[in-house]
Amino acid sequence: MEIAKTVRLYDQDAYATKFEAEVLACEEVEKKEGKVYQVWLDQTLFFPEEGGQSPDMGTIDGIKVLDVQIKDEVITHTLAAPLAVGTMVKGVVDWKHRFYNMQQHSGEHIFSGIVHNRFGYDNVGFHLSDSIVTMDFNGVITAEDIEKIETEVNQAIIENIPVEVSYPTKEEIKVLEYRSKIEIEGQVRIVTIPGYDVCACCAPHVRRTGEIGMLKVMNVQSYKGGVRISILCGFRALEAFRQKADIITKLMAQFSTNQEALVENVTKLKNTNQTMKNQLASAKQELMEYKVAAIPEDSENAILFESDLDTPVVRNVVNGLVEQFTGICAVFVGNDESGYQFIIGSKNKDCRQIAAALREKLSARGGGSDKMIQGSVAASQLQIEELLATL
């Protein structure tokens, strides 16, 4: 099936939300979630998933648009219900989602432009989702420099600079210095933010930088010899700040402190908690030593069942049992209802054979070496004891 290239109305007006189009084709497609319908129109306002950005959302003739993709300049709309071929339909773009994406993308351009101009680094990986924007730069940027760039981006936003879109000729593009994430064939669309960035881009952008509202760096991490920087702009940045402010307010109430002392209070709590964990582990270790001492010295096997015990303590106990007893040495942690985690060791028996028996008779999981195995089993204490007694 050959479909004509889709007229991209969003290139003409990024702020338009309603349009009419003719249905050129409609196909039923089976997906994991059920049947969906791929629809092709002669023209559309729906921006597809392209250039690292999530697609537009909305409806066509009241039917929810589930996805929008582009290939060879043909845009495919995936809908929850079919549309009749040859009919005229009305599309409505979710403006809130579109504008939020525009804020993110325009903010990213300013940030990436500043990085490129100052350090010569390229944005080699870009992803704009509904929750975060990530940029991968092929060079290291210090925390101090990132903070300066963030401030400069917000200064550019305050300046309310016009965002310009142009379509240079082949001759003009040859001498134009611009950023580009990929090799582009055919007509190149250039988005310019004077003084900050010139970049090839297919996505809708705000008219002026002031509409971005603000930009906030949310996270920074080393990535493939460079740096991955996560940002949010505009209303999404505001929503994230509200969430963080709400968390801080609740924590201040819990600790009966102010914001300045909050980190210190949390650190103290963390240290106290770790101290108590260490003390509890020591107490459990000491208790287990008493239980081990209570096992008759002439026993061949030494098997203990505990309701709650940390893995390091279990391993220490099993290692100690192996030194004292010649048979199966094991600690099972849990209960008959939810099952048991176990570590089994022996210096005279092949633990792999014990694991095989547990798998065969009790459907246990796990494995290890001939000296020690580790795993889990959904069986009762009585069933486990009866099986181990036969080995």
Segments predicted by a language model, with ranges:
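A glycine- and charged-residue-rich anion-binding loop/surface
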Residues: 1-391
